[in-house]
């Protein structure tokens, strides 16, 4: 009988200790969660990145737009509409919209992005810089917007996300995922194949988040202070030519224009082309006109699977002579 009473007493003590321990763990976990929430709040950028990168190995597709990219050109489409249409018409590209984050630099662009139910992030501008209207190639505001873009990607890399950056004037005709070498630190598009050196174009590139790429983007962004009048693309080219990439031990690849083509150098093979970039073009109306023709050519190819030449880029080739062109506000 005493043995039975002793066992019952021990059981009561054990049960009491179990519940006390469980209560302690529960309260401690709540404390930790509260501490994390208090010290490390999830900001709007992190929220947008987390949602866009979900289920995609922390890789997010990023593009940047302003008011000029979401306004109709004449009675036609908008640049953003054409960009999104390419995902709908491309091969294996539609699911990638789930991983696209649109960075809006003004309220009009942000509202349009939200209306289209995309993953949207509004980048706040400071110093009274107006990034709303069309920024013509090599204008002061154009250069400023490119540097803001570089700083944003640096921030994203620091947060541990891999990035596929794409200009909005890039048509996605096939998924690039199978054509990118994910083991490389960075892969970047080129304007044209050139034996004398890589004519890189920062309108489309893939970059992994690691210490080497973060160091590259930090150095790249810091050099803006000593690069007045230069666009960020030229500054990156100087870093490449100076051997800085090699100093960091970066493994870099350059994307062939056969698969990642553009108006500077068309791909001759519609059967393998992945993206088409409206590079070598001065302004938005010309880009919209000629990219509309690109999508028309692509739809014709999908219907017949007969390789043919791309339509001439009439407006873009003539855009450099538009000396009286007034940027769209």
Swiss-Prot record:
Protein name: Uncharacterized protein At1g28695
InterPro entries found in the cross-reference section: At1g28695/At4g15970-like, Nucl-diP-sugar_transferase
Superkingdom of source: Eukaryota
Keywords in alphabetical order: Signal
Span of the signal peptide: 1-22
Organism: Arabidopsis thaliana (Mouse-ear cress)
